[in-house]
Swiss-Prot record:
Protein's UniProt name: Fructose-bisphosphate aldolase 2, chloroplastic
Record keywords, A-Z: Chloroplast, Glycolysis, Lyase, Plastid, Schiff base
UniProt source species: Pisum sativum
Classification via PANTHER family: FRUCTOSE-BISPHOSPHATE ALDOLASE
GO cellular component: chloroplast
Family from the record: Belongs to the class I fructose-bisphosphate aldolase family.
EC id: 4.1.2.13
Active site residues per record: 177 (proton acceptor), 219 (schiff-base intermediate with dihydroxyacetone-p)
Any one of the GO BP annotations: glycolytic process
Amino acid sequence: GSYADELVKTAKTIASPGRGILAMDESNATCGKRLDSIGLENTEANRQAWRTLLVTVPTLGEYISGAILFEETLYQSTVDGRKIVDVLVEQNIIPGIKVDKGLVPLAGSNNESWCQGLDGLASRSAAYYQQGARFAKWRTVVSIPNGPSALAVKEAAWGLARYAAISQDNGLVPIVEPEILLDGEHGIDRTFEVAQKVWAEVFYYLAENNVQFEGILLKPSMVTPGAESKDKASPTKVAEYTLNLLHRRIPPAVPGIMFLSGGQSEVEATLNLNAMNKSPNPWHVSFSYARALQNTALKTWGGLPENVKAAQEALLFRAKSNSLAQLGKYIGDGESEEAKKDCCQGYSY
């Protein structure tokens, strides 16, 4: 396609050494939950203040190569009236956009869901490109306690593949994200088995839809035991299982694998990423974290202008920790108790 070279260049830039993605594409409702946790009302002004804090962290671009935005943010300005997209570009951070329309029940399945958003996606993607976005994200989920049924896996894979083809057609590098939810009592071997099945289907349909592998990025879940499982897995074990999965299922043509944190604590997410980068990989193995980058910063800010600088330093510390983990050089110095806290049961975006 006409964007082929540009797609490859964008994907390679996002997957550059020591850098990863800041996911800040929470919907307004989810952003509201985050604000609520620090006692703030969910108003556009408060969302704008928080997003301004995130994108204006000095030197953030040294550790962050891309930022995923919610549609409101792509068209929003900072508190002092600069376009958020422009601020990111000045920071050397590529703007991205969440394009899916969320999850709805999948009729005919075992109480599972599927992802909406293909209708009108081509014209929306073209508009997002015009607005400065250069990559896209589509998140679908697979639930292990509910099966997953063959139907749900097929629907997830097909939807992702259609979205990826449409994105590339409009100049956006698609981030392919079939999140295998942490919920459940299953052990790590069961997660591994399901993940193999999911990624086999995803790549089958990506190929069927003529998606250019050099111009995509992946956002997988790490292979871990279920959140309610009796077993806990060390970073070494998580890395062993996850890399084994990637080696079996992900072609080396794919430039970058940007893991989601999916409810791990901030420190856990960094330790696991570090363990995966202890030896060389055929792809850039990095991060695309939301809560695992933002959590301590949010709590530090608390909605108070006088805390902005400290909150920005907290975010930079996390970004730098994950940058070191991408290089396999993270040692875990200076971590706060907040950063070590487990997230939550029934974690959802």
